[in-house]
């Protein structure tokens, strides 16, 4: 992360348990061992020795005398430059860099099971000496909080609103169109024909990490996402997804990855949101300084 050496690193100060979990270094090592084992051409898969090591790396550890209010370093989750992502919504002033952090424990909010995010806009050209060794939490609540570094290859696509937000008449037309495609596929003599396209998974909202566009509400159904400061309807800023595509959205699989095993190319970030969901982060279009909101789908 492009973080000034003289600027305090974001920390979670909310009171919650933080004294038991897996060590980030163990999580990264576990992934490396497993990836290496399955990449072998001969006898792929972990050896007995590797399985023993993997078991050790999966162990949870306790932090003696850890307080529920000790400053807990957040984990850098995403760093997006406007030069790389043309559709990145406007930040305050002439800021060109968005940085996203999260607390590595699901222990926030009234039910003590919510996420905690921290978003920071900055002007990249103002950063002088860069922090080379950011603080890390000693343990994390789950391995999905620890991202693997990835190089972005942004691609612009057209998105459309979630089906539940469309007018009823239009939804009925889409349903009839999908039924006609399914019937046509069933009657086709060509059994190699792929599954017919559908609005939900193939045409409206792509899976994976993305900036802008429309949010999916497939888990909760739509509900108002208005700014808590000025009541303005908020716009989707960023989607953080647990996978780049899945069985229901295979039409979005990149052509370059058509012949790669699914488990190797769908989760490059190794980030897991809740129970394999997606995190939609919203921003106020009138004032990007206003607090962000988010939903998990």
Language-model features: where?
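Preference for intrinsically disordered or flexible, low-complexity segments
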Residues: 1-297
């Amino acid at each position: 992360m492009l973080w000034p050496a003289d600027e305090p690193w974001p920390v979670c100060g909310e009171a919650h348990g933080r004294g038991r979990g897996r060590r980030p270094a163990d999580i990264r090592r576990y992934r490396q061992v497993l990836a290496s084992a399955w990449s072998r051409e001969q006898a792929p898969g972990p050896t007995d020795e590797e399985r023993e090591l993997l078991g050790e790396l999966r162990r949870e550890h306790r932090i003696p005398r850890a307080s529920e209010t000790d400053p807990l370093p957040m984990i850098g989750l995403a760093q997006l430059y406007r030069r790389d992502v043309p559709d990145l919504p406007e930040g305050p002033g002439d800021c060109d860099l968005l940085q996203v952090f999260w607390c590595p424990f699901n222990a926030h909010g009234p039910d003590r099971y919510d996420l905690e995010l921290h978003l920071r806009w900055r002007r990249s050209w103002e950063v002088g000496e860069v922090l080379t060794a950011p603080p890390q939490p000693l343990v994390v609540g789950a391995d999905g909080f620890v991202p693997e570094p990835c190089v972005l290859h942004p691609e612009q696509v057209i998105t459309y609103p979630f089906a539940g937000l469309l007018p009823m008449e239009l939804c009925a037309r889409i349903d009839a169109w999908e039924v006609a495609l399914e019937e046509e596929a069933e009657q086709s003599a060509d059994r190699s024909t792929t599954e017919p396209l559908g609005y939900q998974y193939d045409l409206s909202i792509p899976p994976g990490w993305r900036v802008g566009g429309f949010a999916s509400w497939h888990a909760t159904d739509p509900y108002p996402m208005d700014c808590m400061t000025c009541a303005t309807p908020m716009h989707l800023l960023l989607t953080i997804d647990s996978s780049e595509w899945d069985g229901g959205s295979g039409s979005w699989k990149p052509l370059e990855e058509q012949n790669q095993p699914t488990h190797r190319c769908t989760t490059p970030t190794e980030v897991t949101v809740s129970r394999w969901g997606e995190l939609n982060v919203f921003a106020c279009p009138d004032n990007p300084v206003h607090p962000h909101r988010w939903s998990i789908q």
